């Protein structure tokens, strides 16, 4: 570097890396003696897209998970300018940590890194940009803090590109590899890469790393999932490709020639990487990875949806007391927002299908089950089994799996052949509870056989729970709304109300559809409404609007007016200890649905539960009033 404004202030210590658009040095500030990273690039008449993006990043970004740019120095020459971008110096990149240093990250560290990457990408997304080059070398680490760097390939997500810059091949989605940007969604490029990055953090190996398209496509199919024929057509893949790969994975053997099968066998022998045992494991982390590496751009998550999928990893992590808990400061006040009719109506369209199903689990109200609500451990297992059963029954009703999963857990009884499918399903739930009762009666030192003589002997509750999951090929949701309540700083004087309301809520199979945090907030809203007369009146008003919204069909029957989404805001003192600033429209609708569940429960079952949970008559009368409101025609 020549003598200029840069050398007057900094001394080069070491060369860190060199790329197409610049060189990165480790430098020392002469006056303060502090070390920084410096990226040097030259701009002449051919001012490049990548150079311009680096300058945008300096002006637009300010986030703890994006590399901080402290200063930009410019040395003006005769026919060119040399830029020196002074940045914070990091300890290294993920590539160095995972492959050079061969560090294996434990689960808590992986999840911590993952949520930091999501935070950084979501911040860029909120500013209108996608990174577009999220490789291992561009994710830096400083004191265990993720720093996303190198913004040269980023795009404005609101602008459809005719041509996308090619980045590192293993992080490119199929639509870019195939050279068809017209089906590319800028919002989904980073999330494909995010799935790849998280795979490397989990297994210390790169999932896809081929130099040609044919091997790359086969690798995607053999290690993750098979694309639909529609997707293959959109990518203009050859007929030979469709015949060889698509049909094999769809098991349409009759359509295959022996030559095609031999060709695939030769590929297996030559690469020895046809399958991937890591992704065959049914874990929450693998589910996250596979969802992000979806061939279909439409079904691939964007960064907002990635955050929700991250929380599903936490929700399904076992056991609960090892799950990372995101702490927040409890605000001194809570805002209750009154939403306009148009906002409630438009949001209600997302929930409309739930109100068409009036299924309840009858066994949930039987005496032998109601006995187990007194202790948190017993109550927790009951509601978790209910949530698991909800997942199963929804799986039974889905158009792809209708009743196919019944053979996993149905057992014969005297009326088995005479029963309907739903009756068989509910009769089988009795067995779930009897399995759970083993823990109730013998925990923590029980010795029993599960599923009679042909199953294994268990010695502790965690082993029981593991095999319970394994037998059913499902996951028990462990971080549910009640767990969130227990782990929060909410005033525990409201615990009995919360337990009671949540017990009512999980009697519906649809309980598994709702976000656990929203359910927690909605039940707390119902409790706050019981204690605060002003909130009660406002909540009733919102429910009345929702009554009307359920009766109005989509778009044509409603007068679209350009009114505000929020028409009023009321602040109350946060004497409840809830870690929330305000209630969202989803919280209002979920509270409405919880009261809808109460409405479906017969008076007989309702009264039995009231006695078991020792709920005072005043609270019951309050719920009756809410039920009467949503029962209006």
Swiss-Prot record:
<feature type="binding site">
    <location>
        <begin position="16"/>
        <end position="24"/>
    </location>
    <ligand>
        <name>ATP</name>
    </ligand>
</feature>
<dbReference type="GO" id="GO:0005524">
    <property type="term" value="F:ATP binding"/>
</dbReference>
<keyword id="KW-0723">Serine/threonine-protein kinase</keyword>
<dbReference type="GO" id="GO:0106310">
    <property type="term" value="F:protein serine kinase activity"/>
</dbReference>
<keyword id="KW-0808">Transferase</keyword>
<protein>
    <recommendedName>
        <fullName>Putative serine/threonine-protein kinase L232</fullName>
        <ecNumber>2.7.11.1</ecNumber>
    </recommendedName>
</protein>
<feature type="active site" description="Proton acceptor">
    <location>
        <position position="133"/>
    </location>
</feature>
<keyword id="KW-0547">Nucleotide-binding</keyword>
<dbReference type="GO" id="GO:0004674">
    <property type="term" value="F:protein serine/threonine kinase activity"/>
</dbReference>
<comment type="similarity">
    <text>Belongs to the protein kinase superfamily. Ser/Thr protein kinase family.</text>
</comment>
<dbReference type="InterPro" id="IPR050108">
    <property type="entry name" value="CDK"/>
</dbReference>
<dbReference type="InterPro" id="IPR011009">
    <property type="entry name" value="Kinase-like_dom_sf"/>
</dbReference>
<dbReference type="InterPro" id="IPR008266">
    <property type="entry name" value="Tyr_kinase_AS"/>
</dbReference>
<dbReference type="InterPro" id="IPR000719">
    <property type="entry name" value="Prot_kinase_dom"/>
</dbReference>
<dbReference type="Pfam" id="PF00069">
    <property type="entry name" value="Pkinase"/>
</dbReference>
<feature type="binding site">
    <location>
        <position position="39"/>
    </location>
    <ligand>
        <name>ATP</name>
    </ligand>
</feature>
<feature type="domain" description="Protein kinase">
    <location>
        <begin position="10"/>
        <end position="314"/>
    </location>
</feature>
<keyword id="KW-0418">Kinase</keyword>
<keyword id="KW-0067">ATP-binding</keyword>
């Amino acid at each position: 570097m020549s003598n200029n404004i840069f050398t007057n202030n900094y001394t080069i210590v070491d060369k860190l890396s060199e790329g197409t658009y610049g060189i990165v040095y480790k430098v020392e500030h002469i006056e303060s003696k502090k070390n920084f990273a410096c990226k040097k690039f030259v701009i002449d008449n051919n001012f490049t897209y990548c150079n311009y993006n680096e300058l945008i990043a300096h002006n637009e970004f300010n986030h703890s998970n994006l590399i901080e740019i402290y200063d930009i120095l410019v040395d003006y020459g005769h026919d060119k300018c040399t830029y020196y971008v002074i940045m914070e110096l990091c300890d290294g990149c993920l590539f160095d940590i995972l492959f050079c240093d061969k560090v294996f990250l434990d689960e808590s560290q992986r999840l911590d890194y993952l949520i930091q990457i999501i935070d950084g990408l979501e911040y860029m997304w909120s500013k209108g940009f996608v990174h577009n080059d999220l490789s291992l070398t561009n994710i830096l680490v400083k004191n265990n803090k993720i720093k996303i760097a190198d913004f040269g390939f980023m795009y404005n997500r609101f602008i459809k590109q005719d041509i996308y810059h090619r980045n590192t091949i293993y992080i490119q989605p199929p639509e870019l590899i195939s050279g068809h940007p017209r089906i590319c969604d800028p919002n989904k490029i980073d999330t494909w890469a995010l799935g790849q990055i998280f795979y490397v953090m989990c297994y210390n190996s790169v999932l896809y790393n081929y130099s040609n398209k044919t091997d790359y496509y086969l690798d995607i199919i053999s290690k993750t999932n098979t694309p639909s024929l529609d997707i293959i057509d959109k990518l203009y893949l050859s007929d030979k490709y469709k015949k060889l790969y698509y049909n094999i994975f769809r098991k349409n053997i009759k359509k295959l020639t022996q030559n095609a099968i031999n060709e695939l066998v030769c590929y297996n022998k030559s690469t020895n990487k046809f399958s991937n045992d890591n992704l065959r494991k049914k874990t929450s982390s693998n589910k996250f990875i596979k969802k992000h590496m979806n061939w279909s751009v439409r079904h691939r998550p964007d960064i907002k949806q990635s955050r929700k999928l991250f929380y599903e990893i936490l929700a399904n992590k076992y056991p609960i007391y090892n799950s990372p808990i995101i702490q927040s400061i409890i605000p001194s006040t809570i805002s209750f927002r009154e939403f306009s009719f148009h906002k409630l109506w438009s949001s209600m369209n997302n929930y409309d299908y739930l109100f068409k199903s009036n299924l309840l689990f009858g066994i949930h109200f039987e005496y032998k089950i109601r006995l187990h609500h007194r202790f948190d451990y017993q109550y927790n297992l009951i509601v978790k089994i209910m949530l698991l059963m909800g997942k199963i029954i929804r799986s039974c009703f889905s158009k792809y799996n209708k009743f196919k999963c019944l053979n996993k857990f149905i057992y014969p009884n005297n009326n088995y052949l005479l029963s309907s499918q739903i009756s068989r399903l509910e009769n089988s739930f009795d067995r779930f509870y009897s399995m759970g009762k083993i823990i109730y009666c013998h925990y923590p030192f029980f010795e029993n056989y599960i599923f009679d003589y042909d199953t294994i002997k268990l010695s502790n509750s965690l082993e029981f729970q593991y095999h319970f999951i394994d037998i059913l090929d499902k996951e028990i949701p462990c971080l549910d709304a009640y767990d969130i309540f227990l782990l929060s700083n909410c005033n525990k004087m409201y615990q009995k109300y919360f337990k009671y309301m949540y017990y009512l809520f999980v009697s519906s199979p649809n309980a598994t559809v709702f976000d656990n945090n929203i359910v927690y907030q909605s039940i707390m809203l119902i409790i706050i409404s019981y204690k605060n007369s002003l909130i009660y009146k406002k909540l009733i008003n919102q429910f009345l609007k929702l009554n009307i919204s359920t009766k109005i069909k989509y778009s044509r029957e409603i007068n679209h007016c350009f009114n505000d989404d929020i028409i009023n805001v009321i602040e109350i003192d946060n004497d409840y200890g809830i870690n929330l600033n305000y209630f969202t429209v989803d919280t209002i609708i979920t509270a409405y649905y919880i009261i809808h569940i109460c409405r479906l429960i017969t008076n007989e079952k309702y009264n039995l539960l009231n006695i078991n949970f020792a709920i005072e008559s005043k609270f019951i009368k309050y719920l009756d009033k809410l039920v009467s409101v949503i029962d209006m025609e």
